[in-house]
């Protein structure tokens, strides 16, 4: 009797497990792995977001570091040698070159010096209400009658003296001006050999 009772109990327990197994919902193995496979996508989105924010940050750093520190002394130095240029023209060019020497060399090489975007220079009016600059030549060198010979005499520059071995950082302000004019004249002489349009401006 005891053996029969044990067999009956074992059969009932086995039947319960079989019923639960058939009653449980079956999921495809790929469906069980789906939540795990979605995690890398979320991680990639976070990485892309972080990367784009880092990119914007680096762009801001580049734009901020590209701004040059232009001092009033730099503008005044250029203006003392080239009084025809407006301070805003000088400032705008210095923001590109960052160098007094390069700005002055650009001028003597006949480069254009535009005003900053959005800036309108004030025009002086004469007594009859007309602008003084009407019918004036557009080239700033012609308006101010600035010629290489004028600068040579103004700064007492002797072109027969070789100044190529001088360092501008070791010179006083007056000697720096002489060196800049000397270098600009030498560069202009080289360019005049091939640039007929520029040569016509200083005739």
From Swiss-Prot:
MF GO annotations: ubiquitin binding; ubiquitin-protein transferase activator activity
Q: Name one GO biological process term.
A: ERAD pathway
Predominantly, its location class is endoplasmic reticulum
Give every CUE domain span. 70-112
User: What CDD domains does UniProt report for this protein, alphabetically?
Assistant: CUE_Cue1p_like (cd14424)
InterPro entries for the chain:
CUE, Cue1_U7BR
Q: How does it assemble?
A: Forms a heterodimer with UBC7.
The protein's job, in short, is: Component of the endoplasmic reticulum-associated protein degradation (ERAD) pathway. Recruits the soluble ubiquitin-conjugating enzyme UBC7 to the cytoplasmic face of the endoplasmic reticulum membrane where it functions in degradation of misfolded or regulated proteins localized in the endoplasmic reticulum (ER) lumen or membrane via the ubiquitin-proteasome system.
Q: What is this protein called?
A: Coupling of ubiquitin conjugation to ER degradation protein 1
Organism from which the protein derives:
Candida glabrata (strain ATCC 2001 / BCRC 20586 / JCM 3761 / NBRC 0622 / NRRL Y-65 / CBS 138) (Yeast)
